[in-house]
Amino acid sequence: MQGLGALFLLLTACLTLKADNVPTLPDIQVQENFNEARIYGKWFNLAVGSTCPWLRRIKNKMSVSTLVLQEGATEAEISVTSTQWRKGVCEEISGVYQKTDIDGKFLYHKSKWNATLESYVVHTNYDEYAIFLTKKFSHRHGPTITAKLYGREPQLRDSLLQEFREVALSVGIPENSIVFMADRGECVPGDREVESTSFARARRAVLPQENEGSGSEPLITGTLKKEDSCQLNYSEGPCLGMQQKYYYNGASMACETFQYGGCLGNGNNFASEKECLQTCRTIAACNLPIVQGPCRAFAELWAFDAAQGKCIQFIYGGCKGNGNKFYSEKECKEYCGVPGDGYEELTRS
């Protein structure tokens, strides 16, 4: 197989793209005297390059993952298990790849998109690194090619990184579509990632200014940014006013109301639910259920439907919802990583 199961997942993302300007795929030669038994075991996916245009859009979300290759249930199969961070959660994905009459070449057929993937082990010394190339053929959308670099350890020699770059370029992958991924460490399936403040701020910044809540200035001064206050408990302050405000509840991942006295307090204090969500919501909200709430307002909003893997419209009642609530389709896609059909496949390594 192109054993590295991640390859087919990247390629299927391009099934929704037109094949305009995609070059004819080159012939690929497998590793000379390929030894299948020696390719088994654990690998780290360290770099990727592809003619699939979606890669450039989501490359900053990709990180080093692990992949284990083993003998399959039959002599004609190879078992593949990939573990990676995706949308803040550690996921484990398993697959089966079919051997061919060429040692080092493997097939995977994705019936949902009527696409066949051909994967090739093109360079490896088995004990240190491996480079895979995968062709994807779609009857509707034409061909794409993806290259991936794997290592037995999370770091490799610079000369091997350069070799991978040269291989990718040689098959028509653009320089700006070659990504050496960040190492966030190994994960255990089901674990949730602790999102750093700087990463969260950078992610939220993708929303254009006109889509963000206007809101008021922070209620306290100093070096603390508004978004850094999101994990604080709400504070009514010492004054005796009765202003309804919103605060972000990290436990429920929702913005809830409280009575603000009118002075002091802290930065977890927002004039509207929209401003609160657009300041404090994290990518974990995309995994929450879609909740209309018990109130009877009629607001047409957007939410991410995890079952369908896309953003959909729903009617929000106006109260007691959660963070999976967006004020435009664009905002939903920016947060939940849905630039187009097939995005989910692309983000899996």
UniProtKB/Swiss-Prot annotation:
Keywords: Cell membrane, Chromophore, Cleavage on pair of basic residues, Cytoplasm, Disulfide bond, Endoplasmic reticulum, Extracellular matrix, Glycoprotein, Membrane, Mitochondrion, Mitochondrion inner membrane, Nucleus, Oxidoreductase, Protease inhibitor, Proteoglycan, Repeat, Secreted, Serine protease inhibitor, Signal
Post-translational modification: The precursor is proteolytically processed into separately functioning proteins.
Free-text tissue specificity from the UniProt record: Expressed by the liver and secreted in plasma.
EC number: 1.6.2.-
One of the protein's GO biological processes: protein catabolic process
Signal peptide segment: 1-19
Listed Gene3D superfamilies: 2.40.128.20, Pancreatic trypsin inhibitor Kunitz domain (4.10.410.10)
Site residues (Inhibitory (P1) (chymotrypsin, elastase)), renumbered to this chain: 240-241
Disulfide bonds: 90-187, 230-280, 239-263, 255-276, 286-336, 295-319, 311-332
Site (Inhibitory (P1) (trypsin)): 296-297
Glycosylation sites: 114, 214, 233
Domain BPTI/Kunitz inhibitor, first and last residues per copy: 230-280, 286-336
Domain of life assignment: Eukaryota
One Gene Ontology term, aspect cellular component: endoplasmic reticulum
Regions crossing the membrane: none
Molecular function GO terms recorded: carbohydrate binding; heme binding; IgA binding; oxidoreductase activity; protein homodimerization activity; serine-type endopeptidase inhibitor activity
Binding residues annotated for 3-hydroxy-L-kynurenine, in chain numbering: 52, 110, 136, 148
PROSITE patterns: BPTI_KUNITZ_1 (PS00280), BPTI_KUNITZ_2 (PS50279), LIPOCALIN (PS00213)
InterPro entries registered for this protein in UniProt: A1-microglobln, AMBP, Calycin, Kunitz_BPTI, Kunitz_BPTI_sf, Lipocalin_CS, Lipocln_cytosolic_FA-bd_dom, Prtase_inh_Kunz-CS
Similarity field: In the N-terminal section; belongs to the calycin superfamily. Lipocalin family.
Protein name: Protein AMBP
Organism this protein belongs to: Rattus norvegicus
Name of the coding gene: Ambp
